[in-house]
C-alpha cells in the first residue's frame, strides 16, 4: 500500500508546487490576500494548491484533512483510521514576502502514525519523501514525476537523510 500512495502524494505535491510557483513568480500578482479567523493570511496560492492536492488525493479511498479545506467536526474525523493530512502552502507569510521559504506538506496517517510523508520546496525544487518501509530521502531538481517512475528509480536518484536509511541505501548499492 505504502509505495502506491507515496507516488500519489509526490505527484500531488509537485503539481501543487507548480500552481504555487505560477502565482509566486508573477510580478503582477497581489496574491489576493485574505485573513482567516485566526488572522493568519490566506492567498490564492493556498486555495489553488489545496484544490490541486484535494483533486488528486480524492481519487484514493482516504479522506483529506487540509488546513485550507472545509473543517469537519472532530466527531466525524475521529473515526478515520487512515487519512491524508495536508498543508498545501506551509509558510504563507514567507510566500507573501517572496523569500522562498515555504513548502507543500502531505502525509498519509494511519491510527495517528504517519506512514508516508512528502515535503516539497517549490522554489528550490527539492523534494523530501519518507515511508515507514523505505526510509527518508531528499531529491533535488525535481518538478514533475516521470511516467515510468518506480520506487527504485526515485530512491536511486535521491540522497538518504537519516543514518539508518543511509545504511539501507548503501546495502542496495545506490551509493
Segments from the language model and where they lie:
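Short hydrophobic/aromatic-rich beta-strand segments that constitute the beta-sheet cores
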Residues: 136-139, 158
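Residues that mark the start of a beta-strand
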Residues: 83, 153-158
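Active-site rim beta-loop-alpha module in soluble metabolic enzymes
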Residues: 159-163
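Conserved beta-loop-beta connector loops within the AMP-binding
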Residues: 142-155
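DPxDG-like acidic metal-binding loop motif
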Residues: 77-137
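N-terminal subdomain of lithium-sensitive/metallo-dependent phosphomonoesterases centered on the IMPase/IPPase/PAP
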Residues: 1-86
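Conserved small/polar residues in nucleotide/adenosyl-binding loops
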Residues: 164-173
Amino acid at each position: 500500500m505504502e509505495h502506491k500512495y507515496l507516488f500519489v502524494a509526490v505527484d500531488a505535491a509537485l503539481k501543487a508546487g507548480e500552481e504555487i510557483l505560477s502565482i509566486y513568480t508573477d510580478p503582477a500578482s497581489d496574491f489576493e490576500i485574505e485573513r482567516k479567523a485566526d488572522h493568519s493570511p490566506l492567498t490564492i496560492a493556498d486555495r489553488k494548491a489545496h484544490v490541486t492536492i484535494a483533486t488528486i488525493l480524492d481519487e484514493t479511498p482516504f479522506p483529506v484533512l487540509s488546513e485550507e479545506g472545509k473543517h469537519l467536526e472532530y466527531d466525524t474525523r475521529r473515526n478515520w483510521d487512515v487519512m491524508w493530512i495536508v498543508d498545501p502552502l506551509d509558510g504563507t507569510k514567507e510566500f507573501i514576502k517572496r523569500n522562498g521559504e515555504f513548502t507543500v506538506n502531505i502525509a498519509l496517517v494511519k491510527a495517528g502514525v504517519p506512514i508516508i510523508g512528502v515535503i516539497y520546496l517549490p522554489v528550490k525544487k527539492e523534494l523530501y519523501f519518507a515511508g515507514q518501509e523505505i526510509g527518508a530521502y531528499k531529491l533535488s531538481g525535481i518538478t514533475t514525476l516521470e511516467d515510468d517512475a518506480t520506487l527504485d528509480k526515485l530512491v536511486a536518484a535521491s540522497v538518504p537523510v537519516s543514518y539508518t536509511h543511509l545504511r539501507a541505501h548503501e546495502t542496495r548499492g545506490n551509493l
